[in-house]
């Protein structure tokens, strides 16, 4: 299979930055694949919603599963039957919309391996709801008399994680922290019940932090300290609010103010992404979960320059299906 290497050369006034990603699959490579790079919840014709695949020692792990994840996996040659685990950073629908397809199509294609879904409190209830949705289809199966269909939850396990959880899997360890995507008062019932998480994956000789959705967070900065790769969300908050105004002209002004406040606290601007990467002294930076989606090199350069005003290391603004080798 032909190997394609693409290098972003961003000749900025601050210097030349380059980041290389691989465009072809390899069973022996450890890779991070940005399956979907567009922030939700509005569907986009050019970009799928937030989802990633991490390939380690030939095993497949999905990190967030936005709408379209199953199809995006197929585009990079990965079979949903071979997914070993799904990690959910939080339970907003643009990060979970693809999970029903993964679970139901695995059932329909008789997947035999166990799939573990890791996620914040509420993940078990979410997955149970997917099983409920699958009930009628599983009972009818293929409509052949005498068939005894397997239960919807066959070979599916849920493990709820939260701030401070540490996991040890055969291929890596995982550290879990609560980030600032939610702003419930600390100690409140909502604070206990709803958590948005960031993950640190420590492979044998490589480390990756996936921020998930987050605003500025000292906990995320600490988690990211010295990692080889930071995969961070990013949002142009002013542009996003203006887009909402254009599509919702009748919305009261106070509503827009509230939306702007929410986005500013719960997401990262380009400059804030650079500040995070700089403060954590990460080896390289991949930016995903963009709002708006970036389609031209001019748009990519515009936002990269803002990030690079703070962080001087290698930067890649990811597109759907980009592949990054996890190797020093």
Swiss-Prot record:
Keywords of this entry: Hydrolase, Periplasm, Signal
EC number(s) per entry: 3.1.6.1
Catalyzed reactions: an aryl sulfate + H2O = a phenol + sulfate + H(+)
Primary subcellular site in the record, as a coarse category: periplasm
Pfam families for this protein: Lactamase_B_2
InterPro entries: AtsA-like_MBL-fold, Metallo-B-lactamas, RibonucZ/Hydroxyglut_hydro
Localisation per UniProt entry: Periplasm
Top-level taxon in the UniProt lineage: Bacteria
Signal peptide residue numbers: 1-25
GO cellular component, one term: periplasmic space
Molecular function as annotated in GO: 3'-tRNA processing endoribonuclease activity; arylsulfatase activity
SMART domains named among the record's database cross-references: Lactamase_B
Classification via PANTHER family: ZINC PHOSPHODIESTERASE ELAC PROTEIN 1
Role: May function as a glycosulphohydrolase involved with desulfation of sulfated polysaccharides.
Family: Belongs to the AtsA family.
Protein name per Swiss-Prot or TrEMBL: Arylsulfatase
Gene name linked to the record: atsA
